[in-house]
Regions:
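Acidic, His/Gly-enriched loop-helix segments that form or flank divalent-metal centers
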Residues: 93-148
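General small-molecule cofactor/ligand-binding pocket signal
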Residues: 7, 82, 121-125
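Active-site-proximal beta-strand elements of phosphoester/diester hydrolases
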Residues: 4-14, 133-141
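Core catalytic region of metal-dependent phosphoesterases/phosphodiesterases
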Residues: 2, 9, 14-117
Length: 148
């Protein structure tokens, strides 16, 4: 039987990530050569798109492009192969609900917004079985807490 090696990373919350921890993860990835590097979502915080930012100066922060670029660079450096949807990735769509005429623009679909195809990353909108009996899913899936 062939053994596979997986690294599962959760909730980077870029740009609020712990920089040294991410640097250490990148070193680990380069050293250990995992078969898959899986991310459980919340890779990009998107705080200015959160419902908590509405009506505050945070909503006008204007750092989304820089935050996205940083997230793309980190995901690339980590060798990320798969990302699953999460409550933070849903923030882009939830923001579009306030401007419904923009819904359907391909570049505003989260996976295209993040250019996952260009980064070689597969995006999963539903739980993803990466190994028989093992599923990649964000913690808010099936949560009984409506704030998750």
């Amino acid at each position: 039987m062939i053994k596979k090696r997986y690294l599962v990373i959760s909730d980077l919350q870029i740009p609020y990530h712990h920089e040294q921890a991410v640097k250490n993860l990148i070193k680990l990835v380069k050293r250990e050569k995992f078969d898959l590097v899986l991310n459980t979502g919340d890779e990009l915080d998107m705080q200015s798109q959160s419902r908590w930012a509405q009506g505050t100066k945070l909503e006008w922060e204007g750092t989304l492009d820089a935050d996205r670029n940083l997230a793309q660079n980190i995901l690339y450096d980590l060798g990320t192969t798969d990302v699953t949807r999460s409550n933070h990735t849903d923030r882009l769509y939830n923001t579009l609900l306030r401007a419904p005429s923009l819904i359907g623009l391909p570049e505003l679909e989260y996976s295209k917004f993040m250019d996952f195809a260009g980064l070689g990353i597969r995006f999963h909108k539903k739980p993803f079985e990466f190994h028989r009996g093992w599923v990649l899913v964000h913690g808010d899936e099936g949560s009984m807490n409506s704030n998750a």
